[in-house]
């Protein structure tokens, strides 16, 4: 038997992050249990039959379909996001692929923003077309480009905002209105903003996807993804077919790790932003850096939109460009003593990477340039260290 405290509609984000989705077993444990099992037993053959044909009460039948610990994570994240439903996946890319695949089919059409993470770009430019889906990428900040692309029918619109790694901010409400007129579902990758800062459903999104590997875990421990939505019919008739039969299921242990990560998400995001804001201003003063891209800076091209769309804050990621190109970027990375070189992000530890040669290495050079990625660009995921230590590390590396 499990016991549960029902979530209140008045609970705020921090409370939902800690209390949402808690279901205790008969042992009444304080910390949620990890149900490390693949299958479940039945009292009779008739009960097993009823569990599979849908005539019996809802229950767990196989952890590829659903698992108690995974279900707790899904419920907590849905409460925090303000969504009716959530399905967890093995990784963020699994979430992106399954969400888009459930929106379209051979002969369909998907429109996306041009500035995308390398694997997302590959899905839209290579994988979907392989299955007969027409795709088109547009400048996400150009309203006229969206109007033109969505002047004809589409199945889905996919966008990252802020984008990885260029931190472009896209007007979700504007795109959603156009997309719905074109018959498309709007799928928003909300990884960089997190559910703490940005609420895509309130702006017209139909589906929100996450790499839970990033801020939701926040400590580089595990992989995970999530698909959030309100349309149960879409789930039952489309999404669940992919999730059930292709097996992108989340490990119960990873679900438990992510469930506990959610408990401190709002605290960590606040700290990331404090450090990132101060560090962005500091980097703007360094002569070796030709450009600092941070939504919280007034110099950001979409600063006003970012402040409106992201709860008045800029997030925990910074992009910067060094005048000396790749050589200067590599020199900075190689001389860092505190900040790690890593392609992950959203970690308690500050991490830096060179997108041209890592996350977007397999993207053709001309496409990288079109996205706004240069050989001198670095992406900095600002962690939770003391801000003065971060400043000193970057200053020393810049001045070798």
Task: Please give the residue ranges for each predicted region.
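PLP-dependent enzyme catalytic core of the Aspartate aminotransferase-like
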Residues: 2, 125, 134-136, 147-148, ...
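Conserved N-terminal alpha-helix of the aminotransferase class I/II PLP-enzyme fold
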Residues: 44-97, 119-126
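Conserved PLP-enzyme active-site core in the AAT-like
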Residues: 2-8, 14-23, 86-288, 293
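Conserved C-terminal alpha-helix-loop-beta "cap" of PLP-dependent enzymes
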Residues: 289-378, 382
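Acidic-histidine catalytic/liganding microenvironments
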Residues: 80, 283-287, 336
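Glycine-rich beta-alpha junction loops
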Residues: 22, 36-42, 192, 214, ...
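N-terminal "arm"/small-domain region of PLP-dependent enzymes with the aminotransferase-like
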Residues: 2-67, 75
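Short, solvent-exposed beta-strand edge segments and adjacent coil->beta transition regions
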Residues: 57-59, 222-224, 262, 313-317, ...
């Amino acid at each position: 038997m499990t016991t549960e405290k029902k979530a209140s509609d008045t609970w705020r984000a921090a409370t939902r992050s800690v209390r949402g989705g808690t279901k205790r077993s008969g042992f009444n444990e304080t910390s949620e249990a990890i149900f490390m099992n693949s299958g479940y037993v039945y009292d009779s053959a008739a009960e097993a039959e009823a569990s599979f044909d849908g005539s019996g009460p809802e229950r767990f039948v196989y952890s590829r379909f659903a698992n108690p610990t995974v279900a707790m994570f899904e419920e907590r994240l849905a409460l925090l996001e303000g969504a009716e439903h959530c399905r967890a996946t093995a990784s963020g890319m699994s979430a992106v692929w399954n969400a888009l695949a459930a929106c379209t089919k051979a002969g369909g059409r998907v429109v996306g923003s041009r500035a995308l993470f390398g694997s997302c770009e590959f899905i839209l430019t290579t994988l979907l077309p392989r299955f007969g889906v027409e795709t088109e990428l547009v400048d996400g900040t150009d309203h006229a480009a969206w109007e033109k692309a969505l002047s004809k029918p589409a199945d889905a619109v996919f966008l990252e905002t802020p984008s990885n790694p260029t931190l472009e901010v896209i007007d979700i409400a504007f795109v959603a209105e156009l997309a719905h007129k074109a018959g498309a579902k709007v799928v928003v990758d909300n990884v960089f903003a997190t559910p703490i800062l940005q609420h895509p459903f309130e702006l017209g999104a139909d589906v929100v996807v996450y790499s839970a590997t990033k801020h939701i875990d926040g400590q580089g421990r595990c992989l995970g993804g999530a698909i959030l939505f309100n349309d149960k019919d879409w789930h039952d008739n489309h999404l669940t077919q992919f999730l059930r039969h292709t097996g992108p299921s989340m490990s119960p242990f990873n679900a438990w790790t992510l469930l506990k990560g959610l408990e401190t998400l709002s605290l960590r995001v606040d700290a990331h932003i404090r450090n990132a804001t101060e560090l962005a201003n500091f980097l703007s003063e360094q002569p070796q850096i030709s450009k600092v891209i941070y939504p919280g800076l007034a110099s950001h091209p979409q600063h006003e939109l970012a402040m409106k769309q992201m709860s008045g804050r800029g997030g925990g990621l910074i992009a910067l460009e060094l005048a000396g190109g790749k050589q200067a970027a590599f020199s900075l990375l190689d001389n860092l003593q505190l900040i790690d070189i890593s392609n992950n992000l959203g970690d308690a530890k500050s991490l830096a990477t060179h997108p041209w040669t890592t996350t977007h290495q397999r993207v053709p050079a001309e496409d990288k340039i079109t996205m706004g990625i240069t050989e001198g660009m670095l992406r900095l995921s600002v962690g939770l260290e003391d801000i003065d230590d971060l400043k000193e590390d970057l200053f020393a590396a810049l001045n070798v």
